[in-house]
């Protein structure tokens, strides 16, 4: 299975990721989310600040750049930039509950606008070319709605969909509901989709992550807050440098 480091705003910057890469490297890392609108519209100083969030070192690879926007053309442009910068994948954020992000029609609010969400995936694909596209989302907005939300996203054939096992309304106030990650896997299988499903939410360590994989059938787990105070979180594998077949398949990496 794939064990990934979750994107966390004001946490998973380049310096933080370098420390994690040194002491316990996950199979793949995500950047903090970056505003595709800002990259398109910000004055020079603001754009330079955003570009700092897209800095990385070879030690952090494979690494995925995450963007948020509600405008497909800007997603396409951001994806094209990420490809130019050498990222291994591009992620579209469709789960962030931040009000300022939602007011832009981005983040979690996209779960209420599946047509636009699909257009953003298409736009990211156009900009990315041969680089894999992924989506990070939740099980629903006010209530679980995977049945009507996920199939539409899967039709766009992203390489990976990460499902945070809570609704937007629940934020992180209730325990993650991993039965919905299992349902996401079932929906994927029913559609005979090749998209990988990662689960996310309340995973304490790699043993816990492996249990979640067994319980749900998901292809891997994204861990976030468990890294706090524990840079060795991912250093529990027999060979932390080994790239799994699943990672190779999702991010087009050669097997080592």
Question: What is each residue range found by the language model?
Answer:
Residues 18-23, 73-90, 94-104, 115-197, ...:
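Alpha/beta enzyme core
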Residues 69, 111, 115, 175, ...:
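Conserved phosphate-coordination/catalytic loops
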Residues 1-9, 15, 119-128, 132, ...:
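Alpha/beta catalytic cores of nucleotide-metabolism and tRNA/nucleoside-modifying enzymes
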Residues 8-10, 34-36, 68-70, 95-97, ...:
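Active-site beta-loop-alpha junctions enriched in small/polar residues
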Residues 29-30, 64-66, 91, 162, ...:
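Conserved beta-strand positions in the central sheet of alpha/beta enzyme cores
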Residues 39-41, 171, 230-236:
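Short, charged, surface-exposed secondary-structure boundary motifs
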